[in-house]
């Protein structure tokens, strides 16, 4: 199964940038890709000009897909306006989000593309961010039983956050394919230095993605064949 879950060591650290970069790199290599962001908070209305900067719009652009009500719904069926954890954002709108429904939707989406298509599922928030009233992002990816690409930033404190997330994934026997350090604009430490420290302490494969740069070609094998 050519499916990868893109998780974050924290919130707003570059998951979508990395997912979009990986999508473009895979497509450039000749591999068909379907990238999905099933849940998103802080999403403007489709009629709002700011929607073009949303995670959903960025992933559609990486696949050369137009922004329409249909493509948006197919990419991100659970969209919430408030920039809060999904369970809180849903409650504010009088809605609910059930883990079983989310997992079922993802399983259907994974099975839909033609054989050989790489399916990327981007999580929401950090690894332990509340997802529903009872479940976290970790529970979601464990239920899907998918290999994981963990995204870290390069900000001050990113090394500790990444090592904590790696330890959590290992404790729960999750297949961690690699860590990607996504450059944090204005960070005092180069992403390569952060990546070296994470690799040294955790003994895992670590890649770097610079802001304005693409996904490294040598890292495309993080997506199972």
Swiss-Prot record:
GO terms for molecular function: ATP binding; dethiobiotin synthase activity; magnesium ion binding. Mg(2+) binds at residues 16, 55, 122. Its cofactor is Mg(2+). The active site is at 37. Keywords: ATP-binding, Biotin biosynthesis, Cytoplasm, Ligase, Magnesium, Metal-binding, Nucleotide-binding. It comes from the Bacteria. It catalyses: (7R,8S)-7,8-diammoniononanoate + CO2 + ATP = (4R,5S)-dethiobiotin + ADP + phosphate + 3 H(+). Substrate binds at residue 41. Its main location: cytoplasm. It is an enzyme of class 6 (ligase). Its EC number is 6.3.3.3. One of its GO terms (biological process) is biotin biosynthetic process. It is found in: Cytoplasm. ATP binds at residues 12-17, 55, 122-125, 182-183. One of its GO terms (cellular component) is cytosol. Pathway: Cofactor biosynthesis; biotin biosynthesis; biotin from 7,8-diaminononanoate: step 1/2. Belongs to the dethiobiotin synthetase family. Homodimer. HAMAP family: BioD (MF_00336). Catalyzes a mechanistically unusual reaction, the ATP-dependent insertion of CO2 between the N7 and N8 nitrogen atoms of 7,8-diaminopelargonic acid (DAPA, also called 7,8-diammoniononanoate) to form a ureido ring. This is ATP-dependent dethiobiotin synthetase BioD. It comes from Methylobacterium nodulans (strain LMG 21967 / CNCM I-2342 / ORS 2060). The gene is bioD.
